[in-house]
Amino acid sequence: MEVSHPAVHPVAVPPVLTEPPARVRMKDYQGMPGTLGGLALRLGQLGFAVLSFSIMVSTPDFSQVTAFCYLVAATVLQTLWSSITAVVDIYALSVRRSLHHSLLVGLFAVGDGVTSTLTFAAACATAGITVLIDNDLDECGQNHCGRFEAAAAMAFLSWIMAAPSFLLAFWSFGNKIVCF
């Protein structure tokens, strides 16, 4: 009777990792909360809102028109929201955490939706009043139409940076809801 002898194959020792393995996050798209793209959008929103606010406040007679006061209020709100969410994004990136909790994603979606809508409405109102002053009343000589136009343009750019943040957060929140 012939019995086979088991062959012993030595197993190599796995290499020691000096760094943690790279994490793979399949559902993080750039622009969503907690990503570098999301942080870039937040900083863009913040920068353009601060510019719009600064330009509008630098004109001495902005407080006489309700639409201009509304733009100032909307840009202050946009600045506060963008600052807070940028800090949250920086924290999430620094500790390598994803922001996929449905309550947090819902808060981002609602906050982005409200602030982007307010900023867009304020920019439209400011642009409309500026067109009225410039084209219809022909009183740009005694008003600061250039500053008003620049403030409206910066508010539109802030809204353009806020819209993708809202759409991605809303889409992500919609994917988290389970329908029965």
From Swiss-Prot:
Highest taxon, organism lineage: Eukaryota
Cytoplasmic compartment segments: 1-36, 89-102, 172-180
Topological category with respect to the lipid bilayer: Multi-pass membrane protein
Extracellular side, ranges: 58-67, 124-150
Cellular component, GO annotation: plasma membrane
InterPro entries per record: CASP_dom (IPR006702), CASPL-5 (IPR045009)
Family as reported in the entry's similarity comment: Belongs to the Casparian strip membrane proteins (CASP) family.
Protein name: CASP-like protein 5A1
